[in-house]
Amino acid sequence: MAHKKGASSTRNGRDSNAQRLGVKRFGGQVVNAGEILVRQRGTHFHPGSGVGRGKDDTLFALDAGAVEFGTHRGRKVVNIVPVA
C-alpha cells in the first residue's frame, strides 16, 4: 500500500465563503421600508419600533425613517424614528 497519496491529491485546499454579516445601515441613516439594517446569526441586536426580524435573524425596516441604535432592558435594539 502506498504511504503517499499521489502527485495531485490533497486533503486540504478548500474554504467556505464569507457570510457577509454585520450592520448594513448605521445610526442616523435614513432608510425606506424593506431595507436590511443588520445581518446576524442569533439576536445580537433586537428589533425595536419600526423594525422586523426575518427567520435568519436579519433586521429590516418596516417603516421609512432614520435608524437609531439603543438599549432596552439591557438589550441592544434597533429602532426606526420618523423623519420630520
UniProtKB/Swiss-Prot annotation:
Pfam families: Ribosomal_L27 (PF01016)
Keyword Ribosomal protein: yes
Domain of life: Bacteria
Keywords, alphabetical: Ribonucleoprotein, Ribosomal protein
InterPro entries: Ribosomal_bL27 (IPR001684), Ribosomal_bL27_CS (IPR018261)
GO biological process, one term: translation
Gene Ontology terms for molecular function: structural constituent of ribosome
Residue ranges, compositional bias (Polar residues): 7-19
Positions of region (Disordered): 1-22
Cellular component GO terms, alphabetical: cytosolic large ribosomal subunit
Signal peptide span: none
Family: Belongs to the bacterial ribosomal protein bL27 family.
HAMAP family, alphabetized: Ribosomal_bL27
Name of the featured protein: Large ribosomal subunit protein bL27
Native organism: Streptomyces avermitilis (strain ATCC 31267 / DSM 46492 / JCM 5070 / NBRC 14893 / NCIMB 12804 / NRRL 8165 / MA-4680)
Organism lineage: Bacteria, Bacillati, Actinomycetota, Actinomycetes, Kitasatosporales
